[in-house]
UniProtKB/Swiss-Prot annotation:
Induction: By Wnt proteins. The lineage of its organism: Eukaryota, Metazoa, Chordata, Craniata, Vertebrata. Disulfide bonds join 40-46, 43-52, 55-74, 78-93, 96-104, 101-110, 113-124, 128-141, 145-187, 156-163, 196-203. The keyword Zinc-finger does not apply. SMART domains: FU, TSP1. This is R-spondin-2. Its main location: secreted.
Amino acid sequence: MQFQLFSFALIILNCVDYSHCQASRWRRSKRASYGTNPICKGCLSCSKDNGCLRCQPKLFFFLRREGMRQYGECLQSCPPGYYGVRGPDMNRCSRCRIENCDSCFSRDFCIKCKSGFYSLKGQCFEECPEGFAPLDDTMVCVDGCEVGPWSEWGTCSRNNRTCGFKWGLETRTRQIVKKPAKDTIPCPTIAESRRCKMAIRHCPGGKRTTKKKDKRNKKKKKKLLERAQEQHSVVLATDRSSQ
């Protein structure tokens, strides 16, 4: 009986102000209910409707939006499309401002592009820009093979000769000014040729080919044959008139 009276006296002393007792009891129940809420995990302060308001040190505050509702979360790392910004009061997750970026290091530097996009110097591209090439089968652009301007077209020639033929080939070239980052990256063509008409068809003092001689002889024979046929026709006509 004395023990019960002593316990009751302690309760009375601790709860002299009834309203203060009620407030303490409400705060304890509130912390207990919020503590079991997964939204409040890692929070220093949390709201039932808005989630985390402040995060524990080393965690990042992320404001998640679902339709018209938004609530705060405390995360160890920021989700895709966001990067972590550490501050004196609280660390926050900020949205990447780089187009087609899935994960970024800072506002203007992407470390992982979305699927189907190439990464180059913190930016994302549909294809590697001029002067760059994909590294093997990855979606990363590296320095490609850079070539200089084309030279003028060379002399028209055939079989190392600049005369004696009607048609030949002329060639132009360009030099590699920067080798690619890896040997597996191909370089553009550095030489190309096209058909051309020779300026000098017959070589001075040279002998014509047998093929040309045969062609010329055939023409002469044809002319001689035509002349002989004409003379024969004239003779026949003369004989008929004399008769």
